[in-house]
Amino acid sequence: MRATLLLAASLLALPPAARAADVKPAIVFDLGGKFDKSFNQGVNDGALRFTKASGIEVRDFEPQNDSQREQALRKFAKAGNDPVLAVGFAQATALETVAKEFPKTRFVIIDSVVDAPNVQSVVFREEQGSYLAGVLGAMAAKDGKLGFVGGMDVPLIRRFACGYVQGAKSVRPDIEVLQNMTGTTGAAWNDPVRGGELARSQIERGAAVVFQAAGATGVGVLQATTDAGKLGIGVDSNQDQLHPGHMLTSMLKRVDVATETAFQAAKDGTWKPGVSTLGLAENGVALAFDDENASLVTPEMKARVMAAADAIKSGKVKVHDYMADQSCPM
């Protein structure tokens, strides 16, 4: 009995690195699912890379409605999964509750901040990457208008839109940017038919380039721009391959890297709670330049984008953050 107690005590005293082999990651995706070709899929890509490198399986759950988020987080924690990653700002309230119930379980949330000693929060400077998308879009549109289709009408998506407008106006101060949000509920992330309708409406009003930040809804946006012979801008994951020759670029939000890094840190024993903010300087956001859009981006256009990125990194250009004051003064 004494030997058993000593063994238990020694295991409890082990540093995190010594217990790293027990890591059992799990993911609760946002509405839209892990194959949305956008935000969720980026997270899934990072998880797959982690599994390939480590041999450790990552469990996951794809909610079909809002109420399932908290249930799934709690189920994974009860099952001993650790860390448990919550995808999307809409999971913040559920995670706040569950993290308190399981103080010894490590949690990660992407796109929101949950202030708890066992939660790592990863957020991005979407306005910076969107600014670059606006620069490139304005150059490609020449004297035409730009379009923006968001998913759910929330401050985070307004942040994308505001950065996009600011970047576009740095190239053409008089440019008009048409904007629509798909809806006000979680269903707005998974309505490609409505996304296509909104994009076609903007194109009919003169949009030559349409940027979407709309989850699976964005698939419909990009199909509509392609069908109309216009240019689309993808988001989160590299969506250039969806319609080669019709995708101007994609505004990459490296949720794949954030996911893989969080799981690897848990495995290595270096995981820490707190807030990580990833922008251009941290390679957390960027534009995609690849074979699929090489014919659409001239050296002059790319140089203008690179110069803008350098100016943002150095602080010479300040990109307004909609979420700082709930306004877009552009």
PLM regions: where:
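Sec/Tat signal peptide C-region and signal peptidase I cleavage site
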Residues: 14-20
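Bacterial N-terminal signal peptides that target proteins for export
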Residues: 1-6
